[in-house]
Amino acid sequence: MARDNGNKDRDGKRPNGGRNRKMKRKICSFCMEKSESIDYKDINKLRKYVTERGKILPRRISGNCAKHQRELTIAIKRARNIALLPFTTE
């Protein structure tokens, strides 16, 4: 029985040209600034972490650490509740 290697093309080569790429780790911007807390009234900073459809960017895309991602989520939800940020855009 032939074994199927899921990461190889039909001709036996790797799809990315045989190069192994390591992704550069993103650094939490809030840790770099050494900010104590994330303010829900700072709309310009919060908008960087919300998509144009109104969804909160995940940690793997935003590059935040777990602690600041949780604080950011709470701040965005608070800003939405008092109508500083929209829930969705149409």
Swiss-Prot record:
Superkingdom of origin organism: Bacteria
SUPFAM superfamilies: Ribosomal protein S18
Recorded GO CC terms: cytosolic small ribosomal subunit
Matching Pfam families: Ribosomal_S18
GO molecular function, one term: structural constituent of ribosome
Cleavable signal peptide: none
Keyword entries, A-Z: Ribonucleoprotein, Ribosomal protein, RNA-binding, rRNA-binding
InterPro entries: Ribosomal_bS18 (IPR001648), Ribosomal_bS18_CS (IPR018275), Ribosomal_bS18_sf (IPR036870)
GO biological process, one term: translation
Residue ranges, compositional bias (Basic and acidic residues): 1-14
Residue ranges of the region described as Disordered: 1-23
The keyword Magnesium belongs to this UniProt entry's keyword annotation: no
UniProt record similarity statement: Belongs to the bacterial ribosomal protein bS18 family.
NCBIfam families in UniProt: S18 (TIGR00165)
Quaternary structure annotation from Swiss-Prot or TrEMBL: Part of the 30S ribosomal subunit. Forms a tight heterodimer with protein bS6.
Function of the molecule: Binds as a heterodimer with protein bS6 to the central domain of the 16S rRNA, where it helps stabilize the platform of the 30S subunit.
Protein's UniProt name: Small ribosomal subunit protein bS18
Organism this protein belongs to: Clostridium acetobutylicum (strain ATCC 824 / DSM 792 / JCM 1419 / IAM 19013 / LMG 5710 / NBRC 13948 / NRRL B-527 / VKM B-1787 / 2291 / W)
